[in-house]
Amino acid sequence: MRRIALTTAAFILAVAGTSFAQGFIQYTSRADFFAVSFPGEPNVRETPWMSEQGITLPAHVYSVENERGRYSMTVVDYKDTEKLHTERAAQCVKAKGEGDACNNGWRGDVAGAIAWGTWQFLKRDAKVTFYGWYVADLVPGQWLQLLNPDGSRTFGAVNMHGTRLYLLEATVPRGAPAPGLFQQSLMFLDDEGRVIRYRSYYSPNHSDEWKFPAPPPPRAR
């Protein structure tokens, strides 16, 4: 009898899982080089993104909102960060700016992009119930969970790959299951739309796109 009960329970859970997965589609963005499972076809809109150091960058928001909750992916392109910072620094010098006001801080803006993206979650009017490091296909990032005042829960993840910052977010109603399928489905694509598989941890700050100079050898004091 116990074996039958366990089998029945397992069957019910399997059916529930299948039912929950129904309606999800694997969405691919060749423009922003990612793929993720959304609960329906997402709407896409352009939006400005203000970097930590005050540079306005282009971004796309892919979103679906239905009875399951609100699911979104925000992608910010940091490609022109160096150019924009250089132009701002030149204007500052021309205007006779003083001290550090005219520094070109583009490398810091890029290196701090994940932390800045994570801060957009942390500063909300919500209780942080989890915060930690994680990887998506060996691309490191930050992962967090929030409990909102209305009892809903927000699950967020922030990664950087190539020149783009990715902010994955799902908010589900009070009592709803965690959006595991959505969270675990993120993949990064190459220029030909193929899924990228790394053999070791990817480092966004030393990727081919940025070509940051290698640090000089350390010196003993």
What are these regions (language model features)?
Residues 1-4:
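Positively charged n-region of N-terminal signal peptides that target proteins for export
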Residues 7-16:
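Bacterial N-terminal signal peptides
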Residues 17-21:
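Sec/Tat signal peptide C-region and signal peptidase I cleavage site
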Residues 22-41:
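Short N-terminal segments immediately surrounding and downstream of signal-peptide cleavage
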Residues 30, 42, 91-97, 101, ...:
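Surface-exposed amphipathic alpha-helical segments
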Residues 37-41, 66-68, 138-139, 159-166:
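Short, solvent-exposed coil/turn segments at beta-strand boundaries
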Residues 48-157, 221:
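Conserved polar/disulfide-associated segments of primarily extracytoplasmic proteins
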